[in-house]
Amino acid sequence: MQSTSFFILTIVWALSIMCVTVSYSDERKAVKLPNPQVDNGRPLMQVLRDRSSSRSFSTQKISDQILSNLLWAAFGINRPDTGRRTAPSAVNWQEIDIYVATAEGLFLYDAKTQTLEPVLSGDIRSATGKQDFVKEAPVNLIYVADFSRMGTAQKEDKELYSAADTGFISQNVYLYCASEGLATVVRGSIDKQTLTKIMKLRPDQKIILAQSVGYPKK
């Protein structure tokens, strides 16, 4: 009897966790980010000198302004007349999407409108990597390649190009973080199968890397 009750309680607990982490929220609205501040920052050579990886994060929240600046630096539109971005992409496919996991939920960055589109409610940060620190970092970026935008390229070419393009974007994040005194680390240690299910990605959407961002722990 006790074992049966324990089993039932375990199932209920697991289902409740799943509901929190993967449920869609129809009532949530897009978050309009402030215009990115593009006329400040430190000299490039100093930023390159200070660029580094950090795996220790404060739980201090990142402001919407800093997040807007960060995402614009990563892969924002820097030439509005053509829609070209701050990082290059093969054939200008712009196949990389940036998903933003915070304590408030999972969002998709829309560079055209500088908004965060709600994807999932609930905090899924712990699912974005296998390291303990990912759940402490206030922002975890998930880089997802949409192969449907890459025309008739061969599968191996899509994988190569999207990996290279993600590298450009993640380095932009590194440089912005170095300029602003933020901590960051790009990560490949991800349970991609589980995270793909949580994010409800299509078969032609592939998780490439993730990147944690926050203030350094003091």
Locations of the language-model features?
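Short, small-residue-rich loop/turn micro-motifs
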Residues: 37, 143-147, 215
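Bacterial N-terminal signal peptides
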Residues: 8-19
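Helix N-cap/coil-helix junction residues
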Residues: 182, 200-201
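Small-aliphatic-rich amphipathic alpha-helix that forms the alpha element of a beta-alpha
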Residues: 51, 70, 98, 139-143, ...
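A glycine-rich helix N-cap at a beta->alpha junction
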Residues: 201-218
